[in-house]
């Protein structure tokens, strides 16, 4: 198994919102270390993975969620946090190496006493919660690498529609969302039953057309210092130039009335299902409909699973999940 240092260029740099700037492979390795006590559980899952490359340069982005916990005979004491990665790679002597690692903390919740003396945590009263490390208008993969050398399958392009929209919404870069939608896009958010941030006397509803859709997401974007829309690929049906995709939301810090006890710390919280209809326009897949269905399920997850997409997409796990939440496809 490769060590972290094997993956880094000798002159690699890292910029991490909680701890600062690091230069050189050895220092970067130190900067990425967990500074807190030895934990009984350390679970990390990645989602929203995008990577684009051109010649000898690649740009990759992803979201991660972390659940670290101590346990005694009766209770669990968890700390959850999540963030965004944008990493640059360079190919040298035929091998890809990380040349620049960027990480922005997006939320933290629970027993932050584990790290509060070592990390700059979120200031929820300010935009982004801290000085941003990542600028999506400059560093998101679609901007940094406008022409991808590696062709994508239809499935990859369809699932990436939501990854791109979420990057735009969470980072306040709504040009990405405009690129994703058809002109007549329809958002079916009536099931959300959340207070609309633009009109506080109303609940979320249905939104027709690109303008209404973008305005709806703009209203959501500023409700907190930073949002993190983690989604995992669950199921996809393609029929000629139309497709339906199912994505699962997971939010480690939004578990409603539940608590992380000794059982739930070993489970993946599922907070919503997104049903997405897409169609191909002039050879490009676009999102023409998204429906939002809130749920609250905890699904057993092996601690070694780092990508929930690979765990559920198209397999027996998805079959069990969809039956438990009443989806019939």
Predicted regions located by residue number:
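Flexible domain-boundary/linker segments
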Residues: 21, 118, 175, 182, ...
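A beta-strand edge to alpha-helix "cap/lid" segment located at domain peripheries
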Residues: 36-153, 222-225, 233, 237-329
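Short, well-ordered alpha-helical packing segments
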Residues: 32-33, 83-87, 166, 217
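Short acidic-aromatic low-complexity motifs
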Residues: 1-10, 159-180, 184
